[in-house]
């Protein structure tokens, strides 16, 4: 038996209703969750992200996630990692860090850090250029185009862009 749900579904609530004997398949295309499927099975979570000819797969059980050790970083290392949307939707917040030996930046964000570059990481990776900007108006290159990510920060990407007069684009990434 297979049941198809909207990508907006609360998977934890659905599993409470359906029971634990369902495999959950979260399918994303280019980091956007498109399908949430439940198939009769053994309770395995399948987080899949399709990017062109490549497919990232991350499988786990809810018990794996519960038992995974969470390490919080004392500071930001050379690389920042963001798991793909399927992994986030599946709820593998601790396990992705444990499997790839990453430290989480904060308990309330899904960004991780490491001094090692992991080419096979299922998500986005950024190399850190600066970890702290004390005077953004002076230090940010207003001629460059920025893609801005705001996680657990009081300003939205649009507010940051307006405040510092930054152009939208993919020349550089600014993480707030």
Where do the model's predicted regions map?
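SAM-dependent transferase fold signal centered on methyltransferase-like domains
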Residues: 2-176
């Amino acid at each position: 038996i297979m049941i198809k749900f909207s990508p907006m579904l609360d998977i934890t609530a659905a599993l409470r209703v359906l029971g634990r004997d369902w495999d959950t398949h979260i399918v994303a295309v280019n980091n956007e969750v498109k399908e949430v499927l439940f198939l009769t099975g053994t309770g395995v979570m399948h987080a899949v992200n399709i990017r062109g000819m490549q497919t990232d797969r991350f499988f786990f059980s809810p018990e794996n996630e519960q038992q995974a050790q969470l390490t919080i970083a004392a500071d930001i290392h050379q690389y920042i990692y963001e798991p793909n949307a399927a992994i986030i939707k599946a709820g593998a917040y601790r396990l992705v860090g444990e499997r790839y030996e990453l430290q989480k930046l904060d308990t309330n964000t899904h960004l991780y850090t490491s001094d090692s570059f992991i080419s096979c990481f299922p998500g986005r990776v950024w190399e850190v250029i600066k970890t702290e900007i004390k005077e953004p108006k002076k230090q940010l290159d207003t001629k460059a185009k920025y893609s801005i990510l705001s996680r657990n920060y009081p300003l939205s990407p649009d507010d940051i862009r307006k405040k510092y007069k930054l152009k939208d684009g993919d020349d550089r990434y600014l993480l707030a």
